[in-house]
Regions:
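Residue position within the beta-strands of beta-propeller blades
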Residues: 99, 140, 183, 240-241, ...
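Short coil/turn segments that connect the beta-strands within blades of beta-propeller domains
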Residues: 94-95, 135-136, 177-179, 234-237, ...
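An edge-strand/N-cap motif at the start of beta-rich repeat modules
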Residues: 73-120, 129, 138
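Blade-level signature of beta-propeller repeat domains, shared across WD40, Kelch, NHL, RCC1
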Residues: 516, 523, 527-562
């Protein structure tokens, strides 16, 4: 049944504490969508101007693509972090962390317990790195020689099996069961040898067995943007390749060379730079968000349907079990709650949940897993001056707003959904009269939020901002990396998410990436790793609960422990 919610349950306040800190790392940002990350995160810059793209308007069609018409003004798209940067971050397996060393054409296999390092040779200029599921193995894509390497560390030294891909590719996607890899062109660059839409489908079982026919080139359409594997009962059965105006489905069971191909709705191919594609973990549910028309599209593997919305959505996310989608409707300050598949078949059943308090909904943050206490969304905007965010219980639509002391740049929820990290942005043009409040506005910083109680705590970081973060595997702690290049000050803040208290720990050099170290018997579950800028390669393993920092330097040497 379709209905409109607008229930506000209250406001939470908190106490401000101060601390000094360091300088930011500027990274890639993308408007209207992005690539989901793992245990770690990348923190974007401040969202930019809230207006522009055409000035006055009566409809979003009068605005620059990606902008929406809000109250007669073309408003900029929300800024959502792109966690998939050009340089592949390290990845973790049950026992090891693997990190690329592009200049030395190698991968460092690091034991996070002993910090022993093994330099594993791969093809020149490695650009892609992914861990195989549930085993100590990884796959590496190398650009210069167009090769793919499988690293097997079940026994040491690591066994390397390399295969040629016939051409250069910049992107790597693994199937959830680890049976296949897809190497495909970087959508931001011209394809190698002008081969538009050609990608390589690699049978990893054949690669590891040393049999022939492990690499098959396939035609995926013009301008590939997304590659998604579909699994059934834990087995990969199909590969969906989204291009500018088509989606091609390749049958992994029969191995047919030609796909089943469908045309995408015109609204989904009008601006491929900003359209968003989201999928459930098994690839069973795939949805697309247009930035030029008030509609979504759904793809179930065989057909595409459009789903009308009352306005252009500024964000789209699937709940973890794929049973519903949540779309941000910024102009009306509401979200659309779409039950899957019922509301895809009968869009009249879509629920519209209004904040009811004048708040803005530009971005949505959902828990990585469905909480035992029920699903909810944290909603906020990156292009307004609001120093608030709201929780929406789903599907009931109960809204609780929380007042903060600073503007919101990003919100990320912990693996257990009990805590959230709120990254703030500075306001150098603050008009606050109180000198203390003005200083808080000008500072960078972050807040940690306890979902159940509604309590939050601000951590100020002075004139610089946080750059990376990673939650511990089971929740309970989060690490936030800070940097100040001018002062050569590099730190990590370990935050206890139970007490909301931060502890500052030293880092040896500039933090680049962060990630989670998987839990292991007899070892603290609160370990994260931080890769750092160093000529020979450097990585630190931090125990967030004890504050122990252990650093390994020298990916191309035998390695030395600091």
């Amino acid at each position: 049944m379709k209905f409109i919610h607008g229930l506000t349950a209250g406001v939470s306040l908190a106490i401000v504490v101060s601390c000094s800190a360091s300088k930011p790392y500027s990274g890639d940002e993308i408007p209207n969508g992005g690539v989901g990350g793992g245990g770690g995160g990348f923190i974007s810059g401040s969202g930019g101007s809230a207006t522009g793209g055409g000035g006055g308007c009566t409809s979003s069609t009068q605005c620059t693509p990606g902008y929406t018409c809000d109250n007669g003004t073309c408003v900029a798209p929300e800024v959502e972090t792109n966690r998939g940067l050009g340089d592949a971050p390290p990845v973790a397996t049950p026992r090891y962390v693997y990190a690329l060393n592009p200049t030395a054409a190698s991968v460092a296999r690091i034991d996070p317990t002993t910090l022993q390092i093994e330099a594993v040779p791969v093809g020149p200029h490695p650009v892609g790195l992914a861990a195989l599921p549930a085993e100590d193995a990884a796959v590496v894509l190398s650009l210069d020689d167009g090769s793919l390497s499988v690293l097997d560390s079940a026994t040491l030294p690591t066994k390397v099996t390399r295969v040629a891909l016939q051409r250069q590719y910049g992107k790597l996607t693994l199937s959830p069961d680890g049976k296949f890899a897809a190497a495909w062109p970087d959508p931001a660059l011209a394809p190698a040898s002008g081969a538009e839409g050609i990608f390589a489908l690699v049978d990893l079982a054949k690669v590891r067995a040393g049999t022939t026919g492990s690499v098959q080139e396939r035609a995926g359409g013009y301008r590939i943007t997304n590659v998604i594997f579909r699994t059934q009962a834990g087995v990969s059965t199909a590969l969906h390749v989204f291009a500018k105006s088509t989606v091609s489905t390749f049958d992994l069971v029969t191995g047919a060379a030609l796909p089943a191909r469908l045309a995408l709705p015109a609204s989904m191919s009008a601006d491929v730079r900003s359209r968003e594609v989201v999928a459930s973990a098994d690839g069973r549910i795939i949805m697309l968000r247009s930035t030029v028309a008030p509609e979504l599209a759904s793809f179930d593997g065989t057909r595409i349907d459009t789903v009308p919305l009352p306005e252009i959505a500024t964000d789209l996310d699937l709940v973890p079990d794929g049973t519903a989608a949540v779309a941000a409707l910024r102009s009306s300050g509401s979200v659309a709650y779409i039950e899957v598949p019922a509301d895809l078949i009968t869009p009249a059943g879509i629920d519209t949940i209004s904040l009811g308090d004048g708040g803005v909904v530009g971005q949505i943050a959902l828990p990585p897993q469905v909480p035992g206490t029920g699903m909810f969304a944290l909603v906020y905007s990156t292009v307004t001056d609001a120093e608030t965010f709201a929780r929406i219980d789903l599907p009931s639509g109960v809204v609780t707003r929380y007042a903060l002391e600073k503007k919101v740049d990003e919100i990320a929820l912990s693996p257990d959904g009990r805590s959230a990290l709120i990254i703030h942005k500075a306001d150098p043009a603050t008009t606050a009269v109180d000198p203390y409040e003005a200083a808080v506005d000008r500072d960078q910083g972050f807040s940690v939020f306890d979902v159940n109680s509604g309590f939050w705590q601000l951590q100020r970081t002075g004139s610089t901002r946080p750059t990376r973060f990673a939650f511990s595997p089971a929740g309970g702690f989060v690490g936030v990396a800070l940097r100040d290049d001018a002062l050569r000050r590099f730190q990590l803040m370990a935050v206890n998410l139970t007490s909301l208290v931060s502890t500052t720990l030293p880092l040896a050099s500039t933090p680049l990436f962060m990630g989670t170290v998987p839990q292991a018997p007899g070892v603290t579950p609160h370990r994260v790793f931080v890769s750092q800028d160093h000529p020979a390669g450097r990585i630190s393993v931090i125990q967030l609960d004890t504050g122990q920092v252990r650093t390994a330097t020298g990916f191309t040497l035998n390695g030395e422990i600091d």
